[in-house]
Each structure stands twice: as structure tokens, then as C-alpha cells.
UniProtKB/Swiss-Prot annotation:
This is NADH-ubiquinone oxidoreductase chain 4. GO terms for molecular function: NADH dehydrogenase (ubiquinone) activity; ubiquinone binding. The keyword Repressor does not apply. It comes from Arabidopsis thaliana. Core subunit of the mitochondrial membrane respiratory chain NADH dehydrogenase (Complex I) that is believed to belong to the minimal assembly required for catalysis. Complex I functions in the transfer of electrons from NADH to the respiratory chain. The immediate electron acceptor for the enzyme is believed to be ubiquinone. Its main location: mitochondrion. GO terms for cellular component: mitochondrial inner membrane; plastid; respiratory chain complex I. Belongs to the complex I subunit 4 family. A stretch of 270 kb of the mitochondrial genome is duplicated within the centromere of chromosome 2 resulting in the duplication of the gene. The expression of the duplicated gene (At2g07717) is not demonstrated. It is also probably not RNA edited and therefore differs in all the positions known to be edited.
Amino acid sequence: MLEHFCECYFNLSGLILCPVLGSIILLFIPNSRIRLIRLIGLCASLITFLYSLVLWIQFDSSTAKFQFVESLRWLPYENINFYLGIDGISLFFVILTTFLIPICILVGWSGMRSYGKEYIIAFLICEFLMIAVFCMLDLLLFYVFFESVLIPMFIIIGVWGSRQRKIKAAYQFFLYTLLGSLFMLLAILLILFQTGTTDLQILLTTEFSERRQIFLWIAFFASFAVKVPMVPVHIWLPEAHVEAPTAGSVILAGILLKFGTYGFLRFSIPMFPEATLCFTPFIYTLSAIAIIYTSLTTLRQIDLKKIIAYSSVAHMNLVTIGMFSLNIQGIGGSILLMLSHGLVSSALFLCVGVLYDRHKTRLVRYYGGLVSTMPNFSTIFFFFTLANMSLPGTSSFIGEFLILVGAFQRNSLVATLAALGMILGAAYSLWLYNRVVSGNLKPDFLHKFSDLNGREVFIFIPFLVGVVWMGVYPKVFLDCMHTSVSNLVQHGKFH
């Protein structure tokens, strides 16, 4: 009875509409009703999260087929539909999205009086668009939602950013990502003219010539590489992180950086397998250079957010190495590392936000000796520093381990360079923790710092649980994605 009820009333369109309905309700609430605005925004995001958990419970991990499929005709004169569905690859990205949005609303809880209801509406609309990206099975509509996310993120950075350069950072973020995606739009139009459809399921059975695959692969790569981001098109990310509010950085690191790698997994690799094999050495070279370069660059940074931002670039390029190993271990490890990065990097940005809220600076030189005045914060910061180093027992370890296993099967030199990047990652993580928490207490202002309050501790608890769960028992996550990953490898005949 309960199973039948869930099948009838829990679907992807309902999941997508939850944050939209919350936004519509907020439009009719005056800004003076701050408590009601907070409550409605938080309830809408929590309902969406619980909704996604119900879909996880209903998900059948034994099949590689898309599940909870819905289709609605969008353009009557073309085979373009509002086509939704998820599989083992996209399921956890949807859950990660719905998990982080309530956190973002709680982060801005105390500043809601100055932010206004528009702040919550922006994040709810962003959630709607991001869920649609991970659920969309129509190529053209995927592009529409893929690019539409830029609008609320542009507003979040440009309006609620923390410094004077926030407008420049917002425009840089917008233009970099938009210009890169124009090539993908041209490729989608070419596919539509050649095949008469943008339906992913049909396109997966369509065989393109090798020459056409190479052209289309390059066009998609131009879009996805900016989102990862890969070197040298990574310049927008550190600036966007520095200028974005704390919640904006959580969305950037936790979700938006996954768009590019998800795009590779969902479209580039299965649709253009011959071109993927052709360009794998190029991806390996670019990713290995990016890992070493950004890891060394991180050691030279003096801004806390830039350190974590460059660390994110290194981790996401490790993900691309795993994906393009084109085997089950590498791809499974890359998905697991993306989920882990969504938790760990978000938590680290929240830690920086805690410090910034208290002294309005992110420069490393102003901090030191916090263990004596903020022991609870220091403990939590230490835990997520260890997770960022991929300590065994934390969520990042098994993902990076599987990536190295997969990469060694494909190219031992690249795998060795990736392992070197992990060592550098441990170096800059420990350096950051030592500078901020250890040493002598700065007498000017740090003695005035208060430790974490109840709301901040409550925000960190779900991240602690998630990181430990994924680190201690990753089988739950790997089992759900295994069939879909195996099907991807077999479809491309990569094994």
C-alpha cells in the first residue's frame, strides 16, 4: 500500500516543483515578516530534501534503465520533450543538491533581516534549476537549465557578495561560463538537424561518424571544461569564491563544479565513445598538469577562500582522471569523490564563513592560536582538514583510492602524478590548519572571538555524519551506482 502510494505521488516533477512553490508563496509575504519568511524557505527546502530521500528509497539499483521517467511535449513541431529521469549516476547529485540548500538558508539565518526574502527565493530557484539539470534527459532542455543556473548565481554573487569587487567577479563568472557553453549549443543544434531529436535515450543508440564525434566532443568539452574547471579556464573560480557570500560558495563548490564532470559522464562519454578514446591522453595530460599546478599555487595563497578554491580545482581534475580511465573503478571513484567534495569543500567554506562573520577578513596572516579561544571550531576544522587530505575513514579516501586504481590500469605515469598531487594536497591542508589554529594567539582581536553557537554546530553535524558514513561504509553509495556505471563502460566498449 505504502509502495503504491509512493509510486503514485512521488515523482521527479513533484521534486522539481517543491522549491518553485516555496518561492511563489514567499512572493506574497512582506519583507517585514522575517520569521515567517525564514520558516517557509526552510520548510520548502527540507520538504524537497525529504522528497529526494523517498526517491532514493524507491530507487531500484539492479537496473541501468532511467527511473521515475516523465515526458511532456515541449515543442510540437520537433521531437523535443520535457523529459525527466534519473539513474545511479545522477541520483546522488540530486540528493546532494537538496541537502545543501537548507544549509544555505540556515547559513544566512542571522542576516536575513538585511538580505530579505529575495535571498531565499534566489536559492530556491537555484535549487529548482540544478535539480532539473541532473534529471533532464533532453539535450536541448538540459542546455537551457544548465545555463539558466547562471542567473540566480549571478544575483547571489553580485548582490550579496562580501567585497567591492563582487560585481566584477559576478560578470567574470557569468561570461566565462556562458561563452564556453555557446559551443555546446551549436553542437546540439547540429545533432538536432542530423537526427531530428534531442532525446538522450535515442541519441545513445545513434552512431555518429568518427569525424562528427570529434567535432561534437570538442564542442561539448569547451562547455564542460569551464564548469569543472580545467586549466587554463579556471581563472573565474577563485575570484567568484572570494567575492561570493558563504552560502554562494557552498553552492559553487558543492554543486556547480559538478555540472562539468556530470556532463562528461552523461553526454560526452556515452554519446561519443570513439572521440572519448581519442581525447583521453589529452584529458589525462591537462588534468595531471592542473593537479600539480593548482596544488603548488595553493601553497602560495594568503586568502582562506582562495586556498579552498584552488584545492577544489585540484580535486575536480583528479575526478576527470578517474572518469577518463573509462573503467568501473575509476568512474565509480570519481562519482564518489564528487559527492565527498560536495560535503568537504562546502564544510570548509562554512568554516571560513564562521571566521569571516567574526572579524570580516579572510587573510591567513590575521589568524593563529584559535585553539585556545575557539576549541569547538578548531576540532571541526581539523576534522574537515583531514577529510580534505583523504584520511582513511573519511569520505574522500575511498573515492581517491578507486580513482588511482582505475588510472593505474590506463596510465601509470598519470596515476603517479595524481598521487603526487594528493601529497601536495596534504601539505597545503596541514599548512592552512597550522597557520589558522596553532601558534600564538594574535593579541589584537582574536581573544574576543566567541566559539561556535548552537546554530553553527547544528549546521556542521550533517556534514560530519555524511563524511563519516561515506568513509566507513561506502558500499551503500557504490551499490546504487554500480549497475549504471557498468552499463556506461559496456555501452562505450571501453572494457
